[in-house]
Structures are given as structure tokens and as C-alpha cells.
Amino acid sequence: MLDKSRLRIAMQKSGRLSEDSQELLARCGIKINLQQQRLIAFAENMPIDILRVRDDDIPGLVMDGVVDLGIIGENVLEEELLSRRAQGENPRYFTLRRLDFGTCHLSLAAPLDYNYTGVECLQNARIATSYPHLLKRYLDQKKILFKSCLLNGSVEVAPRAGLADAICDLVSTGATLEANGLREVEIIYRSKACLIQRDGEMPADKQQLIEKLLTRIQGVIQARESKYIMLHAPSAKLEEVIALLPGAERPTILPLVGDQNRVAMHMVSSETLFWETMEKLKALGASSILVLPIEKMME
């Protein structure tokens, strides 16, 4: 039995979001021994339990109050939400924040030889999908009548097997579509991973732990999106150099021994530093330019 006084977090056991979810928790300082076959893991240094389940079970576990938090793809969350509403339920939960992984989109795809000129071409078509409610919402908005063929896997083989005229499936790179003689024709939903919380009263100690976790997640994401920049620059060009490196705060400026015309500059830049930016810095007289990753960050 799970101890209800501990924070319960559901995450995908295996699949697209599993490794990224594990890495996020680890970088937040949560020490968990995640053995391959164990469905429940206990944090060693915080009152947190991890439930490792199928991704399509996570929204229901949160909405039904079985767990406190869930890490889930927005596509799976939205499909479950629409499914429950279709059954007359009023599911409740909170989205605490989007995360910086799990990027994908749900798309309509058709065979390469399908004469597709617009979504109107799918009028009365048979479409295979694992996301019938998201598909229905999109095509209802377009006033397109269609027949749904529900498949829980290998959706991309449906046209070749004669089960459907087209498909609606998740796309990350498009390689799977291409391998099955399909092409993407419409994007109907864009998705990332998100962190959700159950509705209802939360004990104060749990809520404090959630706030601490959110602060750490923010720090992890900021660190991933930021770089620590060190360089030498002409004193007369400081503002021009700073303009090329947008950051959270003003840079640290240090004098260079034996050089009155140049300074050392240290700063955190909130944007990816491209080669073109470094070339512009060089053109302004900057030198010894170092771009370093940041492991942790808290403003």
C-alpha cells in the first residue's frame, strides 16, 4: 500500500517520455532507484513515491485523485479529457506547467498516391487513429464527415492493409510515415509533456513539496535553455556586445591585468549562441569567447 502522506507522482514506465521524465526528476535532486520491472519506486531523500504506468493511464489516475501529480503528453491528456466529457463527466485537474521535452504533433497522413488537395478530400473517408476524440473535434470543426477506425498501435500500416484511406497519428520526425509510404497532410494538434496536479484539497506539507519541485523544475529548464558566456571585449563596445547576448541580468565586468582598453565579461545568456552570433562578437573585437553549459540555475 502507498503511504498517502507521501507525494505520489505518476510517470510513463517505458516509451517516449520515460527517460526524459526520469532525467528531469534526477536533475531536480530526487534520488530514486528505478529498477526495470518495478512499478513503484520510492525516493530516498524526499517523501515522494513514483508510480510507473502506461501513459494513457496517467490522466485518469490524476483526475480520479489516485496520485497527486502526473507527467504526461498533452496529446494523451487532451484525448482523455475529451473522452470523459463525451461520457458526461466533468474531469478536474490543474496543469502546473509545460515541460521542455516530448515535443510532437498529431497529424493526418495519406498515402503518397492519394490526391490530397485539402481537408475536404477526406469527406466520408475512413481514417485509422489512436486518438478518435481529437480527430473528431478537428474534423467536426471543419464540417467533415468521416468513419473512424480505432487502432491502439501500428496505425501507419492501416492504409496499406486496406483498413483505412488515411491515418491520424503522432509525428516526431516523419521517418515512420515515409517508411510506410505516407505523407503528412495536416497538423491537427501540437503537444509537449506537461506536469499536472489532481483537483481537491492538498495537505500543506505536500503543497510545499510541490512548490519546491516546481522551483527546481524551473531551474532545470532555465539551465537547459541558457549558456554561461565568458569573453574579453573592448570597453568602448560593451553595450553592443551585451545587445548580442540577451540575458536574465546585466553581465559581470572584470578588469584585465595590464590592459586598460579591454575587460572580461561573464554573463548568462538566455538564448542559444549560434556561430553567427560568435562571428558578430568577433567582429566587435571580442576574443577568448567561451560558451559553457549550465547544470543548475536559480534566479
Swiss-Prot record:
UniProt keyword Magnesium, yes or no: yes
Required cofactor(s): Mg(2+)
CDD domains according to UniProt: PBP2_HisGL2
GO cellular component: cytoplasm
Swiss-Prot/TrEMBL GO biological process terms: L-histidine biosynthetic process
Classification via SUPFAM superfamilies: GlnB-like (SSF54913), Periplasmic binding protein-like II (SSF53850)
Compartmental location: Cytoplasm
Gene3D superfamilies, per the entry: 3.30.70.120, Periplasmic binding protein-like II
UniProt keyword list: Amino-acid biosynthesis, ATP-binding, Cytoplasm, Glycosyltransferase, Histidine biosynthesis, Magnesium, Metal-binding, Nucleotide-binding, Transferase
Any one GO MF annotation of this record: magnesium ion binding
Xref: PROSITE patterns: ATP_P_PHORIBOSYLTR
Catalytic reactions on record: 1-(5-phospho-beta-D-ribosyl)-ATP + diphosphate = 5-phospho-alpha-D-ribose 1-diphosphate + ATP
Stored InterPro entries: ATP-PRT_HisG_long, ATP_PRibTrfase_cat, ATP_PRibTrfase_CS, ATP_PRibTrfase_HisG, HisG_C, N-reg_PII-like_a/b, N-reg_PII/ATP_PRibTrfase_C
Family: Belongs to the ATP phosphoribosyltransferase family. Long subfamily.
Subunit structure of this chain's protein: Equilibrium between an active dimeric form, an inactive hexameric form and higher aggregates. Interconversion between the various forms is largely reversible and is influenced by the natural substrates and inhibitors of the enzyme.
NCBIfam families xref list: hisG, HisG_C-term
Protein name per the record: ATP phosphoribosyltransferase
Organism name: Photorhabdus laumondii subsp. laumondii (strain DSM 15139 / CIP 105565 / TT01) (Photorhabdus luminescens subsp. laumondii)
